[in-house]
Amino acid sequence: MWQGGIKMASLNVTDVIKELDISKSYLYKLIDKENILIPRSDTGRYFWDENTVEIIKRFLHIDGLQDKDDTDFLISKLGLKQSFINNRRYLGNKYSLSDFIRKTVDENCKGVNIVIDIFSGTGAVANTFKDKMLITNDLLYSNYISNYAWFEYEKYSSKKIIELIYDYNQVKTKENNYMRENFADTFFSADDCSKIGYIREDIEAKYKNKEINFKEYAILITSLLNAMDKIANTVGHYDAYRKNVDFEKKLVLNVLLPEETVNSNNICYNLDANKLIKSIRGDLLYLDPPYNSRQYCDAYHLLENVARWEKPEVYGVARKMDRTSLKSDYCMITATKAFEELIERADTKYILLSYNNMSDKGNDRSNAKILDEDIMRILSKKGKVTIFESNYKSFSTGKSDIKDNKERLFLCEVFSEEKKKMTSNTIVPFFFW
């Protein structure tokens, strides 16, 4: 007898992969790569017994597979690559400024234990504060799912993620699914569209069948979105695609293994920032709102479509879905009013606003929607304001190279009377008490 009480004489491949807790494709990959000698019948079928299983276990290091060394070993053996949170192109991404932001907070803010990143994008700045309790939020579901993957506290199986990524990379299909029907030979080749559609459908099915939890679901979707973005026939966004191109790059998913030591009280939201601010409280509110009229839901409509997987009708040359509910007030003439309401409702000790000096340096679409004098007027009513600057070259949708582009940090130390007033009016989740 062996674990589970299954007799060796009656073993089949299903019994073996269940005992080893690996996929069938990975089992055969391991046998082939390591030249593991397993007896075969005249028809080529493997004979499985206790000795064979123990031999394979030694190659797997099965008992310690969650350890980093063994995880790295498995990734290497399967010929996979690992990606990290900063490996994604994104408009306004602050990864290059993360050290500047963290240093500013560490040197000027006291008692910061809870950080709210309410326009979190793909999480570059939130990651800088991963030693704190994090509250992240973004209006785009594709960003919410990425933040959940990286920051929410939920156990997941590294081995399961690695094996599924390996399996997805082996997929070869020409099925006429939603992606192929709507996006073939636009942002991706027809075959890659089929592959994207197949993988996304499989992730959805596995979650609905409870084969993966929501953390694993989020990790797999984020890996797929990152892989798409890496090969997309664009200039970094999805407002348009280049015509008459050869699709040389093929879809390859990388492994994402978020840290499991994040704060157990972290929470990620997918809400309008001005609505969410009324029901949360923290020590530091970090703000990185859209600066100009370019809507993020327009620039990333395809990734948002795949993340949501509601399969809506698409239209126009760029094959966009309806994005009415995803439009941000911060990209319109309402930006200043929205910003003022957000600041008035903020219940924190400090507010840190990232805003560059583009108010009059770019074209009409690039120009900042909120003027410096309005920023100072609004923040000064809330507390004492100090400005910090850093030179910065941003990733944008345009081709212009604007000189003397600076990222400014407006740090507002909230007046004590403001803090007292807000504390009495804020609805706070249970874990804040």
What are these regions (language model features)?
Residues D329-K382:
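Conserved Class I SAM-dependent methyltransferase catalytic core
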Residues T52-I75:
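A short, Lys/Arg-enriched interface patch at domain edges and termini
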Residues M133-I135, L139-E260, C297-M332, K337:
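Class I S-adenosyl-L-methionine-dependent methyltransferase module
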Residues D372-M376, K382-K420, I427:
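Class I S-adenosyl-L-methionine
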Residues W2-Y26:
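Polyanion-binding surface elements
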Residues D72-C109:
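S-adenosyl-L-methionine
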Residues D21-R45:
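Major-groove DNA-recognition helix of helix-turn-helix-type DNA-binding domains
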